[in-house]
Amino acid sequence: MIRKMSKNVVVIGTQWGDEGKGKIVDWLAESVQGVVRFQGGHNAGHTLWINGKKTILRLIPSGIMHDGVTCFIGNGVVLSPEALLREIEELEAAGLDVRSRLQVSEICTLILPYHVAVDKAREARKGEGKIGTTGRGIGPAYEDKVARRALRVQDLFNPALFDEKLAEVLDYHNFVLTQYLGAEPVSANEVRDQAMALAPALAPMVRDVSSNLFVLQQEGKNLLFEGAQGALLDVDHGTYPFVTSSNCVAGAASAGAGVGPQALQYVLGITKAYTTRVGSGPFPTELVDEIGTRLATIGKEFGSVTGRPRRCGWFDGAALKRSVRLNGISGLCITKLDVLDGLETIQLGVGYRVNGEFRDVLPYGAHAVAQAQAVLEELPGWTESTVGITEYSKLPVNARRYLERVAEVCGVPIDLVSTGPDRNETIVLRHPFKG
Protein backbone atom coordinates (compact mmCIF):
# COMPACT_ATOMS: atom_id res chain seq x y z
CA MET A 1 0.00 0.00 0.00
CA ILE A 2 1.38 3.42 -0.99
CA ARG A 3 2.12 5.37 2.18
CA LYS A 4 3.06 8.76 0.74
CA MET A 5 1.60 10.74 -2.13
CA SER A 6 3.72 10.73 -5.26
CA LYS A 7 2.82 12.07 -8.68
CA ASN A 8 3.75 10.12 -11.76
CA VAL A 9 3.60 11.40 -15.33
CA VAL A 10 3.73 9.49 -18.62
CA VAL A 11 5.19 11.35 -21.61
CA ILE A 12 3.89 10.04 -24.93
CA GLY A 13 4.49 11.00 -28.55
CA THR A 14 1.12 11.56 -30.19
CA GLN A 15 2.19 11.47 -33.84
CA TRP A 16 4.59 9.23 -35.81
CA GLY A 17 7.51 9.86 -33.46
CA ASP A 18 10.13 12.64 -33.47
CA GLU A 19 7.82 15.04 -31.61
CA GLY A 20 10.50 16.45 -29.30
CA LYS A 21 9.91 14.20 -26.29
CA GLY A 22 13.56 14.22 -25.22
CA LYS A 23 13.69 17.94 -24.52
CA ILE A 24 10.45 17.86 -22.54
CA VAL A 25 11.47 14.82 -20.49
CA ASP A 26 14.78 16.51 -19.75
CA TRP A 27 12.92 19.66 -18.63
CA LEU A 28 10.43 17.73 -16.48
CA ALA A 29 13.22 15.66 -14.92
CA GLU A 30 13.93 18.60 -12.61
CA SER A 31 10.72 17.65 -10.76
CA VAL A 32 11.30 13.90 -10.37
CA GLN A 33 13.49 11.36 -8.64
CA GLY A 34 13.23 8.68 -11.34
CA VAL A 35 12.82 8.47 -15.13
CA VAL A 36 11.73 5.20 -16.75
CA ARG A 37 11.95 3.84 -20.31
CA PHE A 38 9.28 1.18 -20.83
CA GLN A 39 9.28 0.12 -24.51
CA GLY A 40 11.24 0.18 -27.75
CA GLY A 41 14.96 -0.18 -28.15
CA HIS A 42 17.84 1.80 -29.62
CA ASN A 43 15.88 2.44 -32.82
CA ALA A 44 14.76 5.92 -31.77
CA GLY A 45 16.88 8.79 -30.52
CA HIS A 46 15.94 11.59 -28.15
CA THR A 47 17.81 14.78 -28.98
CA LEU A 48 18.60 17.22 -26.17
CA TRP A 49 20.17 20.67 -26.41
CA ILE A 50 21.73 21.74 -23.14
CA ASN A 51 23.39 25.17 -23.15
CA GLY A 52 23.84 24.90 -26.91
CA LYS A 53 25.36 21.40 -26.83
CA LYS A 54 23.65 18.55 -28.69
CA THR A 55 23.20 15.17 -26.98
CA ILE A 56 21.41 12.16 -28.49
CA LEU A 57 20.11 9.40 -26.21
CA ARG A 58 18.85 6.13 -27.68
CA LEU A 59 18.36 3.79 -24.72
CA ILE A 60 19.20 5.72 -21.58
CA PRO A 61 16.34 7.89 -20.25
CA SER A 62 16.71 11.63 -20.76
CA GLY A 63 16.76 12.18 -16.99
CA ILE A 64 20.38 11.03 -16.93
CA MET A 65 21.38 14.64 -17.61
CA HIS A 66 20.25 15.56 -14.07
CA ASP A 67 22.28 14.76 -10.95
CA GLY A 68 20.24 12.93 -8.33
CA VAL A 69 17.80 11.38 -10.82
CA THR A 70 17.83 7.59 -11.08
CA CYS A 71 17.12 6.21 -14.54
CA PHE A 72 15.44 2.87 -15.24
CA ILE A 73 15.23 0.67 -18.32
CA GLY A 74 12.06 -1.36 -17.85
CA ASN A 75 11.23 -4.88 -18.93
CA GLY A 76 9.30 -3.68 -22.00
CA VAL A 77 12.53 -2.49 -23.63
CA VAL A 78 14.46 -4.79 -25.97
CA LEU A 79 18.09 -4.28 -25.02
CA SER A 80 21.27 -4.41 -27.05
CA PRO A 81 24.07 -4.70 -24.45
CA GLU A 82 26.57 -3.44 -26.99
CA ALA A 83 24.50 -0.35 -27.82
CA LEU A 84 23.81 0.40 -24.16
CA LEU A 85 27.44 0.20 -23.08
CA ARG A 86 28.54 2.30 -26.04
CA GLU A 87 26.02 4.98 -25.08
CA ILE A 88 27.19 4.88 -21.46
CA GLU A 89 30.79 5.38 -22.57
CA GLU A 90 29.80 8.37 -24.73
CA LEU A 91 28.04 10.03 -21.80
CA GLU A 92 30.86 9.25 -19.39
CA ALA A 93 33.33 10.81 -21.83
CA ALA A 94 31.22 13.97 -21.56
CA GLY A 95 31.63 13.91 -17.78
CA LEU A 96 28.32 12.35 -16.71
CA ASP A 97 27.97 9.83 -13.91
CA VAL A 98 25.85 7.10 -15.51
CA ARG A 99 26.49 3.65 -14.04
CA SER A 100 25.64 4.56 -10.44
CA ARG A 101 22.32 6.08 -11.55
CA LEU A 102 21.13 3.56 -14.14
CA GLN A 103 19.14 0.40 -13.43
CA VAL A 104 18.33 -2.22 -16.08
CA SER A 105 15.52 -4.72 -15.65
CA GLU A 106 16.79 -8.27 -15.35
CA ILE A 107 13.93 -9.47 -17.55
CA CYS A 108 14.57 -7.22 -20.57
CA THR A 109 14.70 -9.18 -23.82
CA LEU A 110 18.17 -9.11 -25.37
CA ILE A 111 18.92 -7.95 -28.91
CA LEU A 112 21.72 -10.15 -30.25
CA PRO A 113 23.58 -10.25 -33.61
CA TYR A 114 21.18 -12.70 -35.23
CA HIS A 115 18.30 -10.28 -34.69
CA VAL A 116 20.18 -7.60 -36.62
CA ALA A 117 21.06 -10.08 -39.38
CA VAL A 118 17.42 -11.13 -39.79
CA ASP A 119 16.20 -7.51 -39.72
CA LYS A 120 18.57 -6.38 -42.46
CA ALA A 121 18.05 -9.47 -44.62
CA ARG A 122 14.28 -9.06 -44.51
CA GLU A 123 14.40 -5.42 -45.55
CA ALA A 124 16.79 -6.23 -48.40
CA ARG A 125 14.45 -8.97 -49.63
CA LYS A 126 11.38 -6.72 -49.57
CA GLY A 127 12.91 -4.08 -51.83
CA GLU A 128 10.42 -1.31 -52.52
CA GLY A 129 7.84 -2.96 -50.25
CA LYS A 130 9.94 -2.42 -47.14
CA ILE A 131 8.47 -0.88 -44.00
CA GLY A 132 11.50 1.28 -43.25
CA THR A 133 12.98 -0.48 -40.23
CA THR A 134 16.16 0.95 -38.73
CA GLY A 135 17.83 -2.47 -39.13
CA ARG A 136 18.80 -2.68 -35.46
CA GLY A 137 17.05 -5.95 -34.66
CA ILE A 138 14.13 -4.49 -32.73
CA GLY A 139 11.34 -6.35 -34.52
CA PRO A 140 13.00 -9.80 -34.52
CA ALA A 141 13.78 -9.42 -30.79
CA TYR A 142 10.13 -8.69 -30.01
CA GLU A 143 9.16 -11.68 -32.15
CA ASP A 144 11.36 -13.93 -30.02
CA LYS A 145 9.81 -12.47 -26.88
CA VAL A 146 6.27 -13.23 -28.01
CA ALA A 147 7.31 -16.68 -29.27
CA ARG A 148 8.84 -17.39 -25.82
CA ARG A 149 12.27 -18.20 -27.20
CA ALA A 150 14.04 -14.93 -26.25
CA LEU A 151 17.19 -14.68 -24.19
CA ARG A 152 16.86 -12.14 -21.40
CA VAL A 153 19.33 -10.02 -19.45
CA GLN A 154 19.35 -12.45 -16.51
CA ASP A 155 20.50 -15.24 -18.86
CA LEU A 156 23.82 -13.45 -19.34
CA PHE A 157 24.79 -14.51 -15.81
CA ASN A 158 24.00 -18.21 -16.26
CA PRO A 159 26.35 -19.35 -19.06
CA ALA A 160 25.01 -22.90 -19.21
CA LEU A 161 21.42 -21.72 -19.59
CA PHE A 162 22.53 -19.06 -22.08
CA ASP A 163 24.20 -21.71 -24.26
CA GLU A 164 21.17 -23.98 -24.10
CA LYS A 165 18.72 -21.26 -25.09
CA LEU A 166 21.07 -19.83 -27.72
CA ALA A 167 21.43 -23.18 -29.48
CA GLU A 168 17.67 -23.50 -29.79
CA VAL A 169 16.92 -19.98 -30.96
CA LEU A 170 19.87 -19.79 -33.33
CA ASP A 171 18.86 -23.06 -34.96
CA TYR A 172 15.59 -21.36 -35.86
CA HIS A 173 17.05 -18.06 -37.02
CA ASN A 174 19.85 -19.60 -39.07
CA PHE A 175 17.29 -21.73 -40.88
CA VAL A 176 15.33 -18.56 -41.73
CA LEU A 177 18.48 -16.70 -42.75
CA THR A 178 19.86 -19.38 -45.05
CA GLN A 179 16.77 -21.14 -46.39
CA TYR A 180 14.32 -18.26 -46.70
CA LEU A 181 16.22 -14.99 -46.76
CA GLY A 182 19.28 -16.20 -48.69
CA ALA A 183 21.70 -14.74 -46.15
CA GLU A 184 24.70 -16.07 -44.25
CA PRO A 185 24.23 -17.93 -40.95
CA VAL A 186 25.30 -16.43 -37.62
CA SER A 187 27.96 -18.18 -35.52
CA ALA A 188 26.81 -19.35 -32.08
CA ASN A 189 30.34 -19.07 -30.70
CA GLU A 190 30.65 -15.47 -31.85
CA VAL A 191 27.29 -14.52 -30.31
CA ARG A 192 28.17 -16.24 -27.04
CA ASP A 193 31.69 -14.80 -26.80
CA GLN A 194 30.49 -11.27 -27.45
CA ALA A 195 27.65 -11.53 -24.93
CA MET A 196 29.82 -13.05 -22.20
CA ALA A 197 32.46 -10.36 -22.75
CA LEU A 198 29.88 -7.61 -22.21
CA ALA A 199 28.08 -9.22 -19.25
CA PRO A 200 30.50 -8.11 -16.48
CA ALA A 201 30.13 -4.44 -17.41
CA LEU A 202 26.35 -4.75 -17.42
CA ALA A 203 26.03 -6.75 -14.19
CA PRO A 204 26.26 -3.90 -11.60
CA MET A 205 23.30 -2.13 -13.22
CA VAL A 206 20.94 -5.13 -13.42
CA ARG A 207 18.08 -4.91 -10.94
CA ASP A 208 14.49 -5.89 -10.17
CA VAL A 209 13.22 -2.62 -11.62
CA SER A 210 9.55 -3.29 -10.88
CA SER A 211 10.21 -3.73 -7.16
CA ASN A 212 12.46 -0.69 -6.97
CA LEU A 213 9.85 1.51 -8.65
CA PHE A 214 7.28 0.27 -6.15
CA VAL A 215 9.56 1.29 -3.27
CA LEU A 216 10.01 4.78 -4.74
CA GLN A 217 6.25 5.18 -4.98
CA GLN A 218 5.86 4.13 -1.34
CA GLU A 219 8.40 6.79 -0.42
CA GLY A 220 6.39 9.45 -2.26
CA LYS A 221 8.95 9.99 -5.02
CA ASN A 222 7.83 11.47 -8.34
CA LEU A 223 8.40 9.30 -11.41
CA LEU A 224 8.43 10.14 -15.10
CA PHE A 225 7.72 7.43 -17.69
CA GLU A 226 9.39 8.25 -21.00
CA GLY A 227 7.77 6.86 -24.14
CA ALA A 228 9.65 6.28 -27.39
CA GLN A 229 8.34 6.55 -30.96
CA GLY A 230 4.71 7.75 -31.13
CA ALA A 231 1.16 6.51 -30.67
CA LEU A 232 0.52 6.37 -34.42
CA LEU A 233 3.40 3.86 -34.67
CA ASP A 234 1.88 1.59 -32.00
CA VAL A 235 1.88 -2.04 -33.17
CA ASP A 236 -1.86 -2.34 -32.47
CA HIS A 237 -3.25 1.16 -32.90
CA GLY A 238 -0.90 2.67 -35.48
CA THR A 239 -1.05 2.68 -39.28
CA TYR A 240 -0.43 -1.07 -39.42
CA PRO A 241 1.74 -2.55 -40.91
CA PHE A 242 3.78 0.66 -41.11
CA VAL A 243 4.35 0.65 -37.36
CA THR A 244 7.01 -0.17 -34.81
CA SER A 245 7.16 -3.51 -32.99
CA SER A 246 6.00 -2.40 -29.55
CA ASN A 247 3.04 -0.76 -27.87
CA CYS A 248 3.91 2.93 -27.50
CA VAL A 249 0.67 4.17 -25.96
CA ALA A 250 0.46 5.34 -22.35
CA GLY A 251 -1.02 2.06 -21.14
CA ALA A 252 2.21 0.30 -22.11
CA ALA A 253 4.01 2.12 -19.28
CA SER A 254 2.31 -0.13 -16.76
CA ALA A 255 3.25 -3.44 -18.39
CA GLY A 256 6.63 -2.25 -19.67
CA ALA A 257 7.87 -0.97 -16.31
CA GLY A 258 6.07 -3.35 -13.98
CA VAL A 259 3.92 -0.79 -12.17
CA GLY A 260 0.20 -0.81 -11.48
CA PRO A 261 -1.95 1.37 -13.77
CA GLN A 262 -3.24 3.35 -10.79
CA ALA A 263 0.29 4.76 -10.46
CA LEU A 264 -0.02 6.68 -13.75
CA GLN A 265 -1.83 9.89 -12.84
CA TYR A 266 -1.14 12.28 -15.72
CA VAL A 267 -0.41 11.72 -19.43
CA LEU A 268 1.41 14.46 -21.33
CA GLY A 269 1.02 14.18 -25.10
CA ILE A 270 3.86 15.68 -27.15
CA THR A 271 3.04 16.95 -30.64
CA LYS A 272 4.75 19.17 -33.16
CA ALA A 273 2.95 22.25 -34.44
CA TYR A 274 3.04 20.44 -37.78
CA THR A 275 3.38 16.74 -38.65
CA THR A 276 6.32 14.58 -39.71
CA ARG A 277 6.85 10.96 -40.61
CA VAL A 278 9.98 8.89 -41.32
CA GLY A 279 10.01 6.05 -43.82
CA SER A 280 7.04 4.43 -45.51
CA GLY A 281 3.35 4.64 -44.68
CA PRO A 282 0.31 6.83 -45.42
CA PHE A 283 0.40 10.51 -44.44
CA PRO A 284 -2.83 12.41 -45.27
CA THR A 285 -1.55 15.97 -44.63
CA GLU A 286 1.87 15.48 -46.26
CA LEU A 287 3.30 18.41 -48.22
CA VAL A 288 5.41 17.57 -51.26
CA ASP A 289 5.92 21.20 -52.27
CA GLU A 290 8.10 24.12 -51.27
CA ILE A 291 6.28 24.52 -47.94
CA GLY A 292 7.08 20.91 -47.02
CA THR A 293 10.71 21.54 -47.94
CA ARG A 294 10.68 24.74 -45.88
CA LEU A 295 9.36 22.93 -42.80
CA ALA A 296 12.00 20.21 -43.18
CA THR A 297 14.82 22.73 -43.62
CA ILE A 298 13.90 25.11 -40.80
CA GLY A 299 12.84 22.26 -38.50
CA LYS A 300 16.04 20.30 -39.25
CA GLU A 301 13.92 17.25 -39.91
CA PHE A 302 16.43 14.44 -40.10
CA GLY A 303 16.31 11.30 -37.96
CA SER A 304 18.57 11.51 -34.89
CA VAL A 305 19.54 7.82 -35.18
CA THR A 306 19.35 7.05 -38.91
CA GLY A 307 19.84 10.52 -40.40
CA ARG A 308 16.95 9.83 -42.76
CA PRO A 309 15.00 12.91 -43.93
CA ARG A 310 11.53 13.21 -42.46
CA ARG A 311 8.42 13.78 -44.54
CA CYS A 312 6.62 16.96 -43.46
CA GLY A 313 3.02 18.12 -43.57
CA TRP A 314 0.36 20.23 -41.90
CA PHE A 315 -0.79 19.52 -38.37
CA ASP A 316 -3.32 16.67 -38.44
CA GLY A 317 -5.86 17.31 -35.68
CA ALA A 318 -7.93 14.26 -36.57
CA ALA A 319 -4.89 11.99 -36.20
CA LEU A 320 -4.11 13.63 -32.88
CA LYS A 321 -7.68 13.08 -31.76
CA ARG A 322 -7.05 9.33 -32.16
CA SER A 323 -3.98 9.65 -29.93
CA VAL A 324 -5.88 11.67 -27.33
CA ARG A 325 -8.45 8.89 -27.03
CA LEU A 326 -5.91 6.05 -27.02
CA ASN A 327 -3.71 7.57 -24.35
CA GLY A 328 -6.15 9.42 -22.12
CA ILE A 329 -4.13 12.59 -22.68
CA SER A 330 -4.34 15.01 -19.74
CA GLY A 331 -2.65 17.88 -21.55
CA LEU A 332 -0.65 18.63 -24.69
CA CYS A 333 2.82 20.03 -25.24
CA ILE A 334 3.20 21.73 -28.63
CA THR A 335 6.78 21.70 -29.91
CA LYS A 336 8.53 23.51 -32.76
CA LEU A 337 5.99 26.31 -32.94
CA ASP A 338 8.80 28.56 -34.15
CA VAL A 339 9.14 26.51 -37.37
CA LEU A 340 5.83 28.00 -38.53
CA ASP A 341 7.08 31.59 -38.10
CA GLY A 342 6.84 33.62 -41.30
CA LEU A 343 4.15 31.62 -43.10
CA GLU A 344 1.41 33.83 -44.56
CA THR A 345 -1.26 31.18 -43.99
CA ILE A 346 -1.27 27.85 -42.17
CA GLN A 347 -3.42 24.82 -42.86
CA LEU A 348 -4.76 22.62 -40.08
CA GLY A 349 -6.23 19.15 -40.65
CA VAL A 350 -9.65 18.78 -39.03
CA GLY A 351 -10.77 15.48 -40.56
CA TYR A 352 -10.90 13.36 -43.72
CA ARG A 353 -13.10 12.45 -46.61
CA VAL A 354 -13.32 8.66 -46.81
CA ASN A 355 -15.51 7.26 -49.59
CA GLY A 356 -17.37 10.55 -49.70
CA GLU A 357 -18.07 10.66 -45.97
CA PHE A 358 -16.51 13.03 -43.42
CA ARG A 359 -14.60 11.45 -40.53
CA ASP A 360 -13.13 13.47 -37.67
CA VAL A 361 -10.70 10.82 -36.40
CA LEU A 362 -7.89 8.84 -38.05
CA PRO A 363 -9.14 5.49 -39.44
CA TYR A 364 -7.48 2.24 -38.41
CA GLY A 365 -5.00 0.51 -40.75
CA ALA A 366 -2.71 1.77 -43.50
CA HIS A 367 -5.09 0.90 -46.34
CA ALA A 368 -7.92 2.99 -44.86
CA VAL A 369 -5.62 5.91 -44.04
CA ALA A 370 -4.18 5.86 -47.58
CA GLN A 371 -7.70 6.40 -48.95
CA ALA A 372 -8.42 9.30 -46.59
CA GLN A 373 -8.29 12.79 -48.08
CA ALA A 374 -7.39 15.45 -45.55
CA VAL A 375 -9.95 18.18 -44.87
CA LEU A 376 -7.94 21.32 -44.17
CA GLU A 377 -8.89 24.56 -42.47
CA GLU A 378 -6.92 27.71 -43.32
CA LEU A 379 -5.73 30.04 -40.57
CA PRO A 380 -3.71 33.27 -40.80
CA GLY A 381 -0.01 32.95 -40.08
CA TRP A 382 2.30 35.38 -38.30
CA THR A 383 5.43 37.26 -39.28
CA GLU A 384 6.83 37.80 -35.79
CA SER A 385 9.41 35.40 -34.33
CA THR A 386 8.31 33.06 -31.55
CA VAL A 387 11.83 31.75 -30.88
CA GLY A 388 12.66 31.65 -27.19
CA ILE A 389 9.40 33.19 -25.94
CA THR A 390 8.57 31.94 -22.44
CA GLU A 391 5.27 33.75 -21.76
CA TYR A 392 2.08 32.82 -23.57
CA SER A 393 0.82 36.41 -23.65
CA LYS A 394 3.91 37.47 -25.62
CA LEU A 395 3.21 35.09 -28.51
CA PRO A 396 1.89 36.72 -31.70
CA VAL A 397 -1.91 36.97 -31.69
CA ASN A 398 -2.26 34.62 -34.66
CA ALA A 399 0.07 32.08 -33.04
CA ARG A 400 -2.18 32.04 -29.99
CA ARG A 401 -5.25 31.66 -32.19
CA TYR A 402 -3.60 28.75 -33.97
CA LEU A 403 -2.83 26.99 -30.68
CA GLU A 404 -6.35 27.60 -29.41
CA ARG A 405 -7.79 26.04 -32.57
CA VAL A 406 -5.48 23.03 -32.19
CA ALA A 407 -6.75 22.50 -28.65
CA GLU A 408 -10.35 22.88 -29.80
CA VAL A 409 -10.01 20.35 -32.63
CA CYS A 410 -8.22 17.82 -30.44
CA GLY A 411 -10.45 18.28 -27.41
CA VAL A 412 -7.66 18.60 -24.85
CA PRO A 413 -5.91 21.61 -23.25
CA ILE A 414 -2.42 22.77 -24.13
CA ASP A 415 -0.24 22.79 -21.01
CA LEU A 416 3.20 23.47 -22.51
CA VAL A 417 4.57 25.14 -25.65
CA SER A 418 8.16 24.70 -26.84
CA THR A 419 9.61 27.66 -28.73
CA GLY A 420 13.14 26.38 -29.25
CA PRO A 421 15.43 23.40 -28.67
CA ASP A 422 16.87 24.48 -25.31
CA ARG A 423 15.09 23.29 -22.16
CA ASN A 424 14.51 26.88 -21.04
CA GLU A 425 12.67 27.85 -24.24
CA THR A 426 9.35 26.62 -22.87
CA ILE A 427 6.00 28.27 -22.11
CA VAL A 428 4.25 26.77 -19.07
CA LEU A 429 0.47 27.06 -18.89
CA ARG A 430 0.03 24.16 -16.46
CA HIS A 431 2.94 22.18 -15.02
CA PRO A 432 2.30 18.41 -15.14
CA PHE A 433 3.83 17.93 -11.68
CA LYS A 434 2.97 21.24 -10.03
CA GLY A 435 -0.34 22.21 -11.65
From Swiss-Prot:
Chemical reaction(s) catalysed: IMP + L-aspartate + GTP = N(6)-(1,2-dicarboxyethyl)-AMP + GDP + phosphate + 2 H(+)
Alphabetical list of Pfam families matching this protein: Adenylsucc_synt
SUPFAM superfamilies: P-loop containing nucleoside triphosphate hydrolases
GO MF annotations in UniProt: adenylosuccinate synthase activity; GTP binding; magnesium ion binding
One Gene Ontology cellular component: cytoplasm
Predominant location category: cytoplasm
Alphabetical GO biological process terms: 'de novo' AMP biosynthetic process; IMP metabolic process
Functional pathway: Purine metabolism; AMP biosynthesis via de novo pathway; AMP from IMP: step 1/2
UniProt remark on cofactor binding: Binds 1 Mg(2+) ion per subunit.
Domain of life: Bacteria
Cell location: Cytoplasm
Positions of the catalytic residues: D18 (proton acceptor), H46 (proton donor)
Residues that coordinate or bind GTP: 17-23, 45-47, 310, 336-338, 418-420
InterPro entries (alphabetical): Adenylosuccin_syn_GTP-bd, Adenylosuccin_syn_Lys_AS, Adenylosuccinate_synth_dom1, Adenylosuccinate_synth_dom2, Adenylosuccinate_synth_dom3, Adenylosuccinate_synthetase, P-loop_NTPase
Sequence positions that bind Mg(2+): D18, G45
Enzyme Commission numbers on file: 6.3.4.4
Record: residues binding substrate: S304, V305, T306, G307, R308, P309, R310
Keywords annotated in UniProt: Cytoplasm, GTP-binding, Ligase, Magnesium, Metal-binding, Nucleotide-binding, Purine biosynthesis
Required co-factors: Mg(2+)
Function: Plays an important role in the de novo pathway of purine nucleotide biosynthesis. Catalyzes the first committed step in the biosynthesis of AMP from IMP.
Family of this protein: Belongs to the adenylosuccinate synthetase family.
HAMAP family named in the record: Adenylosucc_synth
Protein name (record): Adenylosuccinate synthetase
Protein source organism: Bordetella parapertussis (strain 12822 / ATCC BAA-587 / NCTC 13253)
Gene transcribed to yield this protein: purA
